[in-house]
């Protein structure tokens, strides 16, 4: 019988920098869904890739002294790049697309021309607000505090000749799709899209640019490159063979069952994407699912904020499957989740070491201890076995109901309720007591077999989340391929009675939280520091100062006669200065973290003298010493402005 098909995609990621744990979260979740459908017997196509064109890539490449192609090649295919990350995380994608692939570029040109030929793309001029990092145009009303509503960065005015897509033409059809079907999930995203974009009125979309060249040329007007979101969105079709000869399974897998995307790009996938598909008369994807963000310290994790978490570090420290499990066990898939290293360690210790690992270790250890690694054939059932068997055999249906809704966390909750029940069953049946009585060994074998069957079924359902670990568990309990099937995940008694059992090493040793946190935090801080710009300067002041006003400021050379720390202050130094007037001047300055007092005695500095006195720690400060400040690798640096000692006290700067 021919298998049912299932097509699922991640967004294709923008390789302007290394990917972080937020990208990993999305890809691991999509991988788990793909593995779940394969377990059920579906013929799965799982696509991921990279979105490699656009102004931001062009700018970053120029800053790095590289061509755009070389720049993206390094991030995608280089050491510890995108492909290496997905290999490390055991991602089972069937296909990987790069939007710089020749077949994709040629197909996008054909698709763009189709929309032009049918009148849905026309030439005009664009004037509006543009966010370079997001490659997005915005109207004034869509800005939040004058900034990009997606990323919060500055926008700039952009005006250029451009091609436009008649998005407004499809507003009613898109609204119907959103409001009257289950196309967009979770349902909360529908209200966002309708209220924020549809109701205010969809404007036609700018779909070409002339201000940069790193993109797919419009073949009939080469001065234009195709807008990055047209280029990006059609990857889901070109990767199956639409308008190209590279692949030939578009008819087999399209439409997609699920596009899994972060909530910040739901607008493109739920409004623009279906409208463009309608334009070229292609079926719409069945579902778009907008998952939440991993937030850290209350804000979105992003490369620009410097608060990203490196998945390589976590996977190498805790193991790939532990990280995969944490991401899917801890955060509800449709909502934001607060990421912390403490939560990661707690989840590993509680769920993996104490619950799953302990169940497997205790059970296999007792089979080895009491029966040499293989149970005898006889069985002796007891009333207390019934509840465990009933709970275990009902697990698959409860798990399936949650997984089919993409509620991955809830699916794992169902499994761990059974694991908790199995650990309680051990306490109820006290197999260590049965082991002391030779006449109770058949009952002991029954208890241990019941535990092994529980482990088998739980492991089958955990496989999409922790594939490598589940292979190890199956090997420990002697479960062959038949024992691991979806069909047998609700059938009791499948594990052979005489299966070879081997305890082996513990699956998840407990993590020393204090020691590991100290090591991890130090490593992550070093990474963040290394990723910061070498030098950061304070923003330049745009407001001009009247020259006559500037001349009123009295800058003078001053000799430092004495310098001492101010009591009860960690920051303040008290300077006694010769300003040339014949009277000592006292100025306080908060630079103690940069200088010791004795370093500065006898030096010549610059001060502005005609500021009104200001009390600091009860001491009047009459003026201000001039310093230069900047940041190096995120650390603030300060240099007191010292000048040649031959300059006399009181000399005016001009």
Spans of model-derived segments:
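Phosphate-backbone binding interfaces of nucleic-acid-interacting proteins
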Residues: 531-654
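Intrinsic disorder at enzyme termini
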Residues: 473-549
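Structured secondary-structure scaffolds
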Residues: 1-48, 103-107, 151, 158-369, ...
